[in-house]
Amino acid sequence: MSELLKAFKFDGEPVTKEAYGSGHINSTFLVVTDKNKKYILQKINNKIFPNVEGLMNNIMLVTEHLKKKTDDSRKVLSIVKTVDDKPFAVVDGEYWRAYDFVEDSICLQLPENNDDFYESAVAFGSFAQALSDFPVEKLIEVIPDFHNTPDRFKKFHEVLKKDPLGRAALVQEEIKFCLEREEEMGTLQRLRNEKVLPDRVTHNDTKLNNVLLDKETRKPLCVIDLDTVMPGLCLYDYGDSIRFGASTALEDEKDLSKVSMSLDLFKIYTKGYISALPNLTKEEKEYLPLGAKTMTFECGLRFLTDYIDGDNYFAIHREGHNLDRARTQFKLVADMEAKWDEMKKVVNETI
């Protein structure tokens, strides 16, 4: 560990290192030096992100651009370089990075009230706005085709054909639900290909716990966990936030009668997001509801594909866990369809 701690340009000698936070992908530690300077030290999961150099280059480019937009150091993650001036260190075959600790900030797992949810929308909208003049072609796709729904359907059809465990017979209703929506769910990708919807810098994990809020004011400071920052549609980020933020139930709720999309929460998030992102194009605004529906559907499709394939991708904690997850997402999609006119009305009124 001492070799690792010596690898970074910390201010002072590190005196303590303890586990920090609750992320699933990377191991995170808080390091404090003898000058009482605090840093976040993180092991990068190179199984999930094999191109560590490309990933860290993305983060460096984005954070450097964001720094030009603010004088407040707490408003942007700040990478601590290694002693040989690199953005990450390799020690014993493991990849590590460090950030300055953001003082007087809090990170919430779930919103404690509607204001928290609204502020997360402002945070992600502001993130997109601040990066709207960034040359997005400079970024690599960390996970190629991450939200390419037609590509997800291609994998779905391949798995259906193989049906390794004979599970397809058990989920005919869910399969029918997907196939009926296949054409519509390719709309965003088609509009992206046709350049009707512009590529932007997208975050791709827009959960509340990826926003640091000011401890006193509860206003957003900065967006964190930039591993999946890459080119994409802002509708991906907006849609994913609605998918889990406006749902009335947990992602794996078995009792589908508890699952719906709250129009109130939809309205709160939409208002916050649009207010912070004034340069949304006319087309982007028009397709916001479809962003929410597509991201929710795509997530369900991935869960169903994994269930039929034998649960190889998502970690499961019970029999049929991925099927429960898929059904929850599809119930949300159906509820959005039932509330479609109201969703469009919310967007139009907010604009």
Report the location of each language-model feature.
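Juxta-kinase regulatory segment immediately upstream of eukaryotic protein kinase catalytic domains
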Residues: 1-18
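ATP-dependent phospho-/nucleotidyl transfer catalytic cores
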Residues: 18-22, 43, 49-53, 105-118, ...
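Conserved ATP-binding subdomain of kinase catalytic cores across diverse folds
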Residues: 19-20, 24-39, 44-154, 158, ...
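Catalytic activation segment of kinase domains across protein kinase-like and atypical kinase folds
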Residues: 195, 209-250
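Transmembrane helix-bundle signature of multi-pass membrane transporters/permeases
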Residues: 230, 291-295
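Active-site activation/catalytic loop segments of kinase-like enzymes and analogous catalytic loops
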Residues: 235-278, 294-313
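All-alpha amphipathic helical-bundle segments outside canonical DNA-binding/catalytic cores
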Residues: 280-292
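Long, compositionally biased intrinsically disordered regions
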Residues: 336-339
